[in-house]
C-alpha cells in the first residue's frame, strides 16, 4: 500500500513531465466521466478527490453563498488557495453536472477563466429520455477529447481500459469479501485509501499492487478487536484526506465492515461490458443499472432494499450516516431511513461534517462516536 500511496502523491510531478513531453492533461471529477477514454486517446487524467480540510471550502465564500457541500466547495477552494497543483496547468477540467452543488462550483471555475467542460447527468436515471441524453453527453465528450488531443479515439484501446478497470474492481471486490468475516483483516481506513490511490495511479500498477495486497490479506489475522461492533458507513463520500471519522470509529473499537457511498470511491461493484458500443457499455454500467445515488430519483426505496441486503451479507449491527453539510437531499433520505431502520431494530447515527476538525471540534465529535460504538457493543 505504501508504494501505491507514493505513486499517488507523485502523480502531479508525473503530469508536469507528461505535459512537457507534449501530452494533454485533463483534470476531472466524477464517476460519470469515462477516464478510460482519456487514457485511451493519449491524454493524462487526474481525478479531483480531495476533502477533509476546512480552509478550501472557506476560500469560496467570496464567490458563493456558504450553503454548498464541503466536497464540492473543496474542488474550487483548493484551486483558489493553490493547494490543487494540477488545475492551473490542466488543458481541460471536466466536471459532471449531476447536482446544484457541483454546478455552482463549476460556474466559479468558469468565472476564473479555467478551461471547463461539463458533462450533464440527469437525476431521473430510469427514464428513457434521460438515458438517451446522458449517452448524447458522452458522445459530445468524445468529440471534445478528439478535438483537444487531435486524434481519433481508438475504441479497441478503450475496451482494453474497460477490461483493466474491471480487473481492478474484481480485486477490490475480493478484498471487500474479506470484510464479511467475523474479524476482517483490513480496516475501512485502509480500504478507502486503496480506492483513492487506484483512482490516481495507472491501471497496471494498481492491478499488480492489489493482487499482492489480496494475497497477503487472505490469510492475515483480523485487524480489529474481538467481537467488534460491525458498522456500515453510508453517505455521499469519504474523500481523499477525510479520514478523521473512520479513524475515530476504529480507535473506539468499531469495525466499519461495509460502505455504501456515492462518490469519491471506485464503483467497484460494477463491471463495464467489453462488447458493443463503448458509449452504451459505459452508460449501462455506470448510469442505467448501477445503484442510484441519493440525489437520483426514484432511488430511496431502491437504495434501502440494497442496504438491507448489505446488512444481512456483512452481518451489520448499526449504520453510521455520514452526511456532508448542506446536503439537503441526503438529509431527507436520512429521515426516511431512520424510520425504516427503526422498524428493523437497526440503530443509526447521523453525523454531519463541514470538514471542521480542529481540536475544539474533534473532542465532542470523538465523544459522540465513542458513545455510539459503545452503545452498539452493549446491544450485541
Please provide the spans of the model-predicted regions:
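Acidic/His-rich segments in extracytoplasmic proteins that coordinate ligands and/or metal ions
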Residues: 74-147
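Short hydrophobic segments within beta-strands
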Residues: 29, 232-234, 322
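Redox- and metal-dependent alpha/beta enzyme cores, enriched for Fe-S-associated oxidoreductases
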Residues: 31-32, 37-52, 56-60, 236-299, ...
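A charged, amphipathic alpha-helical module
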Residues: 1-24, 143-271, 300
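C-terminal hydrophobic structural anchor segments
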Residues: 298-345, 349
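Glycine-rich, highly charged phosphate/nucleotide-binding loops
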Residues: 66-84, 295-308
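Peripheral docking tails and interdomain loops at the edges
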Residues: 335-380
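Metallocofactor- and cofactor-centric catalytic cores in central/energy metabolism, strongly enriched
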Residues: 6-19, 27-31, 35-36, 55-62, ...
